[in-house]
């Protein structure tokens, strides 16, 4: 019961942190969550529990890094492989050496091996904190990808270095050759293990699908279990579980499109479920981090043998050393024209960008969790030297780097984009959202909801067309092009009609009736000033096709109207085939709009002799289709935000708009 109450309190703190962030958006959510965690643990009856390092890594770090590996663009990571490796490997080992000697020189009470261990656990950067901070400021895309790639790799290298340093401190023995061989084995073994296990899981899912087992809930459960299985298996083998889940995430991303392209429901459910899981896990990581800090601080602050001001000074010196080393490392290797890769297309930051990279090296959960894994006793049974001080220094550096980044990054980064640029991004995002909605509707369309789906598709195509209008200096230009495309469709229909007449598929009378109507449509599209007259004639045509006007026997009227309908269906299909072959990227939306018109026309003609079951039933079907599309749009907004294609304020505006649209739909106004 106590564990359940603790979990409830932690989840409540996460919810409160996001509410607080709405009122003080200039403070990132992770910092608010850490502060609330500290507050919750500061009272005698507050949250007090010992952090289980192994459980923390498997429960939080594994799924978070798996998701980061899955969503980070692989091509961009590959292009930045040289700088990422220099930061994730080279800088980590440089930090261990320089930081270790600096800490030991400054605090002789900490043995050199333990100082190396502290420097090693301070070397990994927190990709979650970086993502949260970058959401508030406009950072160059190259820097963001670099920081994400570094965060995926340096957790493993830092933890491996930490493991060997602490082992040396505990046993008093250290072999550089053995450590190097073990590092290569643990790293490469972790990557290989992640790829192999992911491949086996993917094959297993494909096998289930071939057996007809396409239950979304079952496949979603397999997805959720995947990072835990990979991490635990890798650790059991003795290789890096962290690198294994990163490799597993990347492997799943490679196979994702082929696996789930035909399972649109799984895509929607997967995106929504993972968004919730990641939201909770990210929040728990920082809240738990905050709850551990008061106990760590109180031990040192209550120790009369050490000056409080002195240990605060230690924290500031260590933080400054880490940032300075990071700055010099990036500056020398980048401006040295990259002896690893001299490709001019690789992003090369200037002095300001180098400073951005240095400040963005925020430490976080991995640092604190790793430091808590330091044993209490050495091999000979004596207490581990200055363990509490090491924990305090680690916690202090985490807070210091987080606060510095929060304050300095907005100053260094560019101001918010100009209105014109912002509107352009907003327009682009809205087009992507509409395309997502259209894809969702088409994938989910069946015979039962086909009429309602086509009606909703027409509405979204109209919205897409209206967005397209906004990119032109005059809306007349796009309207004129649409008339040209419609005229091309009519021309294709005429040619198909003549071929059917020549083959003897239809009587001459039917061909004459439709040819006359096609001529009227040509005039309509060629001369917009005759719109009123043409619309009237078109209405008469549709009425005649569906109900008949001539004083002929009833069966004769029905037969003739049925033949005309069937012929028009064939000509409309010919028009669709022509437009599909001749559509251009520049006016793709216009062509799709006309094609959709023809598809709706075909459906109406084929089902004109049937009545809809009821208007209420039809509207309910439309509402169901629209709500599914809205959910897909929400998921796409989150994806665009996570991939840095839109800023936080644009994502907020889009979400608010979608909320208004959904409310209008539920009230029957949309």
UniProtKB/Swiss-Prot annotation:
Keyword entries, A-Z: Cell membrane, Ion transport, Lithium, Membrane, Potassium, Potassium transport, Sodium, Sodium transport, Transmembrane, Transmembrane helix, Transport
UniProt cross-references to Pfam families, sorted A to Z: Na_H_Exchanger
Transmembrane feature ranges: 5-27, 46-66, 83-103, 105-125, 156-176, 182-202, 228-248, 276-296, 314-334, 355-375, 389-409
Major subcellular site: membrane
Gene Ontology biological process terms from the UniProt entry: potassium ion transmembrane transport; regulation of intracellular pH; sodium ion import across plasma membrane
Superkingdom to which the source organism belongs: Bacteria
Compartment(s) of residence: Cell membrane
GO molecular function: potassium:proton antiporter activity; sodium:proton antiporter activity
Induction pattern: Constitutively expressed, with higher levels at stationary phase.
Bilayer topology term: Multi-pass membrane protein
GO (cellular component) term, any one: plasma membrane
InterPro entries with a match to the protein in the record: Cation/H_exchanger_CPA1, Cation/H_exchanger_CPA1_bac, Cation/H_exchanger_TM
Similarity comment text for this entry: Belongs to the monovalent cation:proton antiporter 1 (CPA1) transporter (TC 2.A.36) family. Nhak (TC 2.A.36.3.2) subfamily.
Biological role stated in the UniProt entry: Transporter involved in the efflux of sodium, potassium, lithium and rubidium.
Protein name stated in the entry: Sodium, potassium, lithium and rubidium/H(+) antiporter
Biological source species: Bacillus subtilis (strain 168)
